[in-house]
Regions:
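Glycine-rich/acidic phosphate-handling loop/turn and adjacent ATP-lid/helix
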Residues: 53-86
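Glycine-rich nucleotide-binding loop
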Residues: 111-119
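Conserved short strand/loop->alpha-helix "switch" segment adjacent to the catalytic nucleotide/phosphoryl-transfer site
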Residues: 3-22
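Glycine-rich phosphate-binding loop
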Residues: 84-98
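C-terminal beta-strand of the catalytic ATP-binding
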Residues: 61, 119-123
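Short beta-strand/loop element within the Bergerat-fold HATPase_c
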Residues: 41-53
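Conserved ATP-binding N-box helix of the HATPase_c
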Residues: 16-40, 97
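Glycine-rich ATP-binding loops of the HATPase_c
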Residues: 102-112
Length: 123
């Protein structure tokens, strides 16, 4: 795991609880996905973008399910996990609810050949 933090957390315009909830879900998902891969990679960047005055938290991980539909992962009940499905499919949906309550937050999800990426922007 690689981690880089270059940000003062005192000026974030989000409650500590909501930020921890988002990060906990994203990190749990990244760890679960990377565990399933032969090459287990998790990259975390925390930094400030001074050009447009935003904070960025980027979490990237290797993933196995290349057919993953990133348009559906935020739907309530959608899960890539096959066991105990009633316990899964709520994490990213909860993030979506937090994003809707906070107009200063954006989350961009992308996938490439090797890495799945979640970029949280805080304005």
């Amino acid at each position: 795991m690689n981690m880089e933090i270059m940000l003062d957390f005192n000026d974030l315009n989000i409650s500590t609880y909501e930020l921890c909830r988002i990060l906990g879900i994203l990190l749990d998902n990244a760890i679960e996905a990377a565990k399933m891969c032969e090459e287990k990679i998790i990259n975390i960047q925390v930094r400030r973008d001074f050009k447009i005055d935003r904070k960025l938290i980027i979490i990237e991980n290797t993933y196995k399910n290349k057919s993953l539909n990133i348009d559906k992962i935020f739907e309530k009940g959608y899960s890539t996990k096959k066991n105990n499905e009633e316990l899964h499919g709520l994490g990213l949906w909860n993030i979506r609810r937090i994003l809707h309550k906070n107009s200063n937050l954006n989350l961009f999800t992308t996938k490439k050949d090797k890495l799945f990426s979640q970029q949280l922007e805080i304005y």
